[in-house]
């Protein structure tokens, strides 16, 4: 988008917010991810909102708030020759206490970026000699697709797929 298009979009959104907001009413909106919080602050959006609309910083996205213990477990699995880590790309740079998946990958760890959890099934079939460890991370809204994947793995009779789970509750 050009700067003019961005300005037009912002103006349109602000007009809609002002039209929907009832004077004297308090509306609280939660920005869930720390990246959103930074963007809102940097762009000065808080100051543009009418009084009565409050922005509340939330818990942080599951990736941003992943603890080092979880990452250290993932790294320990990644360092095993008999293991492939299946993960979403945004997990690659999350630091553990001594490394990250991205760094481990440069040292020869088998890290496979996936776009949907169900990809672990094909990965498992392609590499039956390897243990496939899926880093199942997300909010409670993503649990259903993880459960569907667990069920599909079970129904396919795959014995080499494992789930390292860390879901967050909003």
Describe each PLM feature range.
Residues 1-129, 143, 153-155, 164:
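Metallocofactor- and cofactor-centric catalytic cores in central/energy metabolism, strongly enriched
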Residues 135, 139-170:
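Phosphate/pyrophosphate-binding betaalpha-module
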